[in-house]
Amino acid sequence: MKPVFSVDQIRRAENTLFELQADPDELMISAASAVADVALAMVDGPAPAVSSEESILLLVGPGGNGGDALYAGAFLAEEGHHVDALLLGNGKVHQSALAYYESLGGQIISDFPPHYLYRLVIDGLFGIGGRGGLTPELASLVESFSASGIPILAIDVPSGVHADSGELPPGVMVTVEGFDNDAPMARQKIPAHIDADVTITFGGLRRAHAVSPACGEVLCADINIAGGGGKSLSAELSQVQAEDATPQMFASKAYQRKDSLFERANLKATAPHIHRIGQHFTVLNMEPGPDHDKYSGGIVGIVAGSGTYPGAAVLSVKAAVRATSAMVRYVGPALNFVIQSLPEVVATQSLATAGRVQAWVHGPGRGLEAEQSAELAELLSRPEPVLIDADSLSLLQLSAELRQALRERKAPTVLTPHKGEFERIAAELRSEGVEIPQADKDPIGAAQALAKEFDCCVLLKGKYTVIAAHDFVHAINAGHSWLATPGSGDVLSGLVGAHLAQSYAELNRLPEFFPDVTLSDSAIYTQIAPAATIHAVAAGLAARTEFGFAPTSASLIADAIPAATAKVDLKRIV
């Protein structure tokens, strides 16, 4: 797990170090050294089939990012690699970095080269201050590398990717070589950004690293200067964040594949100062305590399913059963299906007869009628945590009264929309004058805005899941895309609901030991990220076979929750 910072915070921390540098390029050289270490690890791996040479190409922009690339290229040339630099700054270049690069044998080229000459491409074009996309000509060159499997290492942020939001520029139309001009596929739309295989950044993560697949595998190296007692960028960033008193942001990666650069090149051994994004949570242990029973461990109540969608109830309840040793209650018309599949569940048809519950889940496959709306209104009036998913999110979209009830609610609430559900709710709020960013352009800002509007926690689902509350943001890269299967959201709701119930039960025991402690909603919300991580790990395990990965299903994901729970690093805090 790594902290995430805005561009403004990065700039302010860097400026402090710039003022203390003994040499104008001291910090840049420190960054370039890390770039070179990663580049060496990448070229030591298997060579692309189309690459006939061992050369390295630098794409060099006019600013500091280009300077990083040139200094890194100099270090690589010093190691004996042939390095070419394509200067793309319209006559502007970091002069001292260029001079050092050339002094160590680095070459300058002026024409766009054929892709097969290179073993690795280093993107030093835009950096975190860049705006806009690549030109059609440059986009075509980059596409030729990507299409041929030649790896690209981006410095700081892949060029074209907005560092604060992860937003991508519109694609560009190009004429592809090898086709007649009037051929149907001669003109194609290609990305106007760089899709990196690896991104190396410094001091801490940028927001784009937390949400953009264009960054590829993200690695982070701390950089420092000799002056000021050896100050580091990470320390300055922590100071800036403390001064801002803004919500803390973190990013993590759930499922670590064995074929990653970090594993393949043994980068941890060769460059221990460079780190990947990991898990590392401090969370509640799911093992019952010695004084627990089926009630005290946290009972989750799941209100889901209908005559049309009984399977949604089964999947959500199954996930909860697999995630907790405590009792799971079911409320809804699909109780026969649920009990047949999961006889340990206590089922009823009505909230009035549900019994004691520590957290509620409402919505999966439940329906959009007046009965379901009344159920949701009833749950919003109760003190227990409520997770709102699927059909219940649509009920919020359709009912101004329910939205107002949510605003007035004083108990913990979690919304779990995918981007389509998010946008439907956001459209209603925008019509009321509320500013909500688009989820596909700025997922962090969008989730934060919705969480602020309803004073709740928002879990915006996707391969990159964003969890936002009033005082923190946590983005989780699943590490794969196997969650894109019907019913996986129902599984997530039951899994998170079980964690909420246990968290609510455990945290309410704290006053026994710490009578002066006042509990906040955030203490419960922080347990959502481990649940989402377990969900992603379970999908990875469910998709894994002895021969490799293959399509999986929501049922198999639910079955893999116990193994995923054991795999994720958990620590008891109570």
UniProtKB/Swiss-Prot annotation:
Residues 277-574 are annotated as: ADP-dependent (S)-NAD(P)H-hydrate dehydratase. Its EC number is 4.2.1.136, 5.1.99.6. The keyword DNA-binding does not apply. Its cofactor is K(+). PROSITE patterns: YJEF_C_3, YJEF_N. In the N-terminal section; belongs to the NnrE/AIBP family. In the C-terminal section; belongs to the NnrD/CARKD family. Bifunctional enzyme that catalyzes the epimerization of the S- and R-forms of NAD(P)HX and the dehydration of the S-form of NAD(P)HX at the expense of ADP, which is converted to AMP. This allows the repair of both epimers of NAD(P)HX, a damaged form of NAD(P)H that is a result of enzymatic or heat-dependent hydration. This is Bifunctional NAD(P)H-hydrate repair enzyme Nnr. It comes from Corynebacterium glutamicum (strain ATCC 13032 / DSM 20300 / JCM 1318 / BCRC 11384 / CCUG 27702 / LMG 3730 / NBRC 12168 / NCIMB 10025 / NRRL B-2784 / 534). The gene is nnr.
